[in-house]
A protein has these predicted regions:
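Mid-to-C-terminal Rossmann-like scaffold of FAD/NAD(P)H-dependent oxidoreductases
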Residues: 16-111
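A short, polar/charged loop-to-alpha-helix boundary motif
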Residues: 109-126
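Glycine-rich loop(s) and the adjacent beta-strand/alpha-helix scaffold that form part
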Residues: 1-9
Length: 131
């Protein structure tokens, strides 16, 4: 099903494509970095090879003057938010859902945000990032 459409001769990746996330829901990520992740999964499928379920962690960033704002995962309004750093200009917040890390949002802390990607993909307990 990786990249498949209703037509057997058409495959889709990128902004226009909605893919089934391994936990069961459809997800459409509108960011160019997602295309590389999707291509790594889709090309073997196009060649007829078995493709294991892959977890793509949605990611985007925006440079606002001299502060890079980043988001990893799928934070939702109903998540528990743990603000672990905030000096009025730079900040780091983890989003918890059902005891696991659902996302991270940071401003001016690119290294700390990116370190959480594998934790989100693995469904790690929130304690792993709050420790």
């Amino acid at each position: 099903d990786v990249g498949r459409t209703a037509s057997p001769h058409v495959w889709a990746i990128g902004d226009v494509a909605s893919w089934r996330h391994p936990v069961g829901h459809q997800v459409r990520v509108e960011h160019w970095s997602n295309v590389a992740d999707q291509a790594r999964a889709m090309v073997p499928a196009m060649l007829g090879k078995d493709v294991p379920a892959t977890v793509t962690v949605p990611y985007f960033w925006s440079d606002q003057y001299d502060v890079k704002i980043q988001c990893l995962g799928e934070p939702e309004a109903t998540d528990t938010v743990h603000v672990v750093e905030d000096d009025g200009r730079k900040f780091l917040a983890f989003y918890e859902r059902d005891g696991v890390v659902a996302g991270v949002v940071g401003g001016g802390m690119p290294g700390k945000v990116m370190k959480v990607r594998n934790k989100i993909a693995a469904g790690a307990p929130i304690a792993d990032v709050l420790g």
